[in-house]
């Protein structure tokens, strides 16, 4: 194969002509994934490039060759090799960003109503999972505890509404906006950036890192809220207050021992 290539390139018919060899399949995937990213990051950024911050600091060791520090949130850690395939990495990167955004909104929605309720604001059920479960009650669910606002009695109607509304927004984003001009579905900009946060490339690059760091924390927080709801039947702020009042008796280990057989 190498000999044939050498013979072809040395052919007199090709003399003086530039010959471009096609990239390999992995390179094609990597190129297609990088087309959607505008990289204008300062070489001195601590979050990008080979000298970026690593997951264990100076004890991190050499990161995998495919983790070059090009994308936000890359700390050089990929034990499972999830980023080795360029196409899989591109898909997972988009999924992580989208789930991070939903998790941040969800965590705020779980904590804020309970915080208001604990400070005297009355608007119905404040605990996030109890508020949603009211849809199954005989009287249905009044948004913000006000019957003059949206009154819901059918979980199927809510499900259909969410599918339509969320599907429309996601379709708009993936399709590139009304004119199909958006080149990056993860960071579409335009009408999705009314404050112009992406106008400065260096500031935007740092905001991408902040978004992922907070989004990853929010995903772990939401998982914790789910576990708390199942184990204690209380909201996150009530669980926090119980722990601060009696940390010895109100902690993860104490609740875990309740599930020990024979206890």
UniProtKB/Swiss-Prot annotation:
Subunit (UniProt): The LHC complex consists of chlorophyll a-b binding proteins.
Pfam families cross-referenced by the UniProt entry: Chloroa_b-bind
The keyword Flavoprotein appears for this protein: no
The protein's name in its UniProt record: Chlorophyll a-b binding protein 3, chloroplastic
Binding-site positions, chlorophyll b 3: 154, 170
Molecular function (Gene Ontology), one example: chlorophyll binding
Residues at which chlorophyll b 5 binds: 162, 259
Chain positions recorded as chlorophyll b 1 binding sites: 55
Binding residues annotated for chlorophyll a 3, in chain numbering: 134, 144, 211
Binding-site residues for chlorophyll a 2, renumbered to this chain: 99
Residues the entry annotates as binding chlorophyll b 2: 101, 150, 179
Residues at which chlorophyll a 4 binds: 214
Modification Phosphothreonine, positions: 36
Keyword tags: Acetylation, Chlorophyll, Chloroplast, Chromophore, Magnesium, Membrane, Metal-binding, Phosphoprotein, Photosynthesis, Photosystem I, Photosystem II, Plastid, Thylakoid, Transit peptide, Transmembrane, Transmembrane helix
Residues given in the record as chlorophyll a 5 binding sites: 210, 228
Comment block on domains: The N-terminus of the protein extends into the stroma where it is involved with adhesion of granal membranes and post-translational modifications; both are believed to mediate the distribution of excitation energy between photosystems I and II.
Keyword field contains Transmembrane helix: yes
Membrane topology listed for this record: Multi-pass membrane protein
Binding-site residues for chlorophyll a 6, renumbered to this chain: 243, 252
Residues that, per the record, bind chlorophyll b 4: 162, 173
Family, per entry: Belongs to the light-harvesting chlorophyll a/b-binding (LHC) protein family.
Transmembrane segments: 97-117, 149-169, 217-237
Described function: The light-harvesting complex (LHC) functions as a light receptor, it captures and delivers excitation energy to photosystems with which it is closely associated.
Binding site for chlorophyll a 1: 77, 83, 96, 216
